[in-house]
A protein has these predicted regions:
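Membrane-embedded transmembrane alpha-helical bundles that form the catalytic cores
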Residues: 1-461
Length: 462
């Protein structure tokens, strides 16, 4: 079920929203759990049991670690076993197909296992629970259904943000939903919905048309526009989902951490990754990079740590060579930036630093988007070989590209924090204006959703 679908907006959300008015927290949690499992079962009925099984592994491992609190060795064995099972499950369903295809020369056949939606996200949440419990950062959750609600809670289940248990530990047991939570959460949800329907979906066709079209009609300019369009599409698609998840969570009394902070205003690749998919970046930092030694090791080991983290980051996004290449490329760029290039970049004017950073990001998204290496190589070469094709000829090749190109203008504007400059204050009339604007935007989104074809979020694939 997609947040932007008619089914979700007019059937599921109103019914699930009734949970807010249930005063008993145990009953409210039970209803939210049932709603979340229904939400997941809507598209993946067979995979609900798999998610519950992974949660059960974490639940039982938690009790075992508490039992062995005075025996560190046994406690660590339990942790390692739990991690092995959780990652093993992720590997089988996400990477086994890829491994068998890669090693097909050994006679291995592709098992064609279906990828459970959201498995990368909920696996990382379960891992954070068992690791943080081992570290003593959180308390044991003795109620299996509460733990399952944390893992399966429908706002963030499919595409994040990756919510750590410590963020919602208290709110699972005790939370109060105020009118401010409902209005603020709904407004945030509508902003995310608008990002998806009014911006991401509209600019998406630029890259689709160019990459699927005859190259003789598209020169370097159009290939750059395609790269920029996909850069905008993936930002508004993914940050839109995060906004909707954060807004929905707020409406039910949960406060999720931010996942994006205007990444396209960054002046360096390092800054970009502090602003993009924050929940994933900090997850790898806290559970992989720092345990490997972080930057408090020799230079050689530090370089190793960076490459391991970014190789895993690439593979987390997808089981294909282009994702691994994308992740390792960013690892190498960050190494060059930290070891040498950074001090020179700081001497450049800010507009030039921003332009260079965005060029790197756009190239990165081309690698991310195109899984076929031949097509990827052609697109990257065409971007930099100054092939000239008159713009009129490119537009005439497929005139349906014109509206998406025009939609790129507002998308570029709203990828910056320009809206943050609008300050209405806290008076009653300002609140009325905000709510009226929100309802108007919601109505526009509904009109777009009625005519839109099925267009799932990009990160549903991961």
């Amino acid at each position: 079920m997609v947040f932007s679908s008619q089914t979700f907006l007019f059937f599921f959300l109103p019914l699930a929203g009734l949970c807010v008015f249930v005063r008993s927290k145990p009953l409210q949690n039970a209803l939210l759990l049932m709603a979340s499992l229904l939400f997941y079962a809507w598209g993946e009925p067979k995979m609900v049991a798999l998610m519950a099984l992974v949660t059960l592994v974490a639940y039982l491992s938690g009790f075992a670690m508490v039992h062995f609190e005075e025996r560190p060795g046994a406690k660590k064995v339990v942790l390692v076993a739990a991690i092995f099972v959780i990652i093993g499950n992720l590997f089988v369903f996400k990477y086994l197909n890829f491994l068998c295809r890669t090693l097909s020369f050994l006679g291995l056949e592709d098992p064609h296992l279906a990828l459970p939606i959201g498995i990368s996200f909920y696996s990382f949440q379960v891992l954070s629970y068992v690791i943080d419990l081992y570290r003593g950062r959180i308390g044991l959750q003795r109620n299996f259904f509460y733990l399952l609600m944390y893992v399966s809670f429908f706002p963030q289940l499919i595409a994040g943000p990756i919510v750590r248990y410590e963020t919602v530990e208290k709110e699972i047991r005790t939370r109060n939903v105020t009118m401010d939570d409902l209005t603020t959460g709904f407004r945030r949800f509508v902003v995310g919905l608008a990002k998806k329907l009014l911006l991401a979906n509209q600019v998406a066709q630029v890259a689709t048309i160019v990459y699927a079209g005859d190259p003789k009609y598209y020169g370097s300019l159009m290939y750059w526009l395609a790269a920029i369009a996909y850069t905008l599409q993936i930002y508004f698609d993914f940050s839109g989902y995060s906004d909707m998840a954060i807004g929905l969570g707020r409406m039910f009394g949960f406060h999720f951490l931010e996942n994006f902070n205007y990444p396209y205003i960054s002046f360096s690749v390092t800054e970009f990754w502090r602003r993009w998919h924050i929940s994933l970046s900090t997850w790898f930092r806290d559970y992989v990079y720092i345990p490997l030694g972080g930057n408090r090791v020799s230079r050689g080991k530090w370089i190793r740590n960076i490459l391991i983290v970014w190789g895993l980051t690439g593979l987390w996004h997808g089981a294909d060579w282009n994702f691994l290449a994308w992740g390792l490329s960013y690892g190498l760029i960050l190494l060059v930036e930290k070891l040498w290039l950074g001090k020179y970049l700081e001497r450049l004017p800010k507009p030039l630093r921003w332009l260079l950073c965005m060029m790197v990001v756009c190239v990165g998204w081309v690698m991310f988007n195109l899984t076929d290496f031949t097509q990827m190589r052609f697109a990257l070469v065409r971007m930099f070989n100054f092939t000239h094709v008159p713009l009129v000829r490119s537009l005439a090749a497929d005139v349906s590209i014109v509206p998406p190109l025009l939609w790129m203008v507002p998308a570029l504007i709203f990828s910056t924090p320009i809206s943050q400059g609008i300050r209405l204050g806290d008076s009653w009339w300002a609140e009325v204006v905000r709510n009226m604007a929100c309802l108007a935007l919601f109505a526009i989104c509904i009109l777009f959703s009625v005519s839109a074809s099925f267009n799932p979020f990009i990160y549903f694939r991961f």
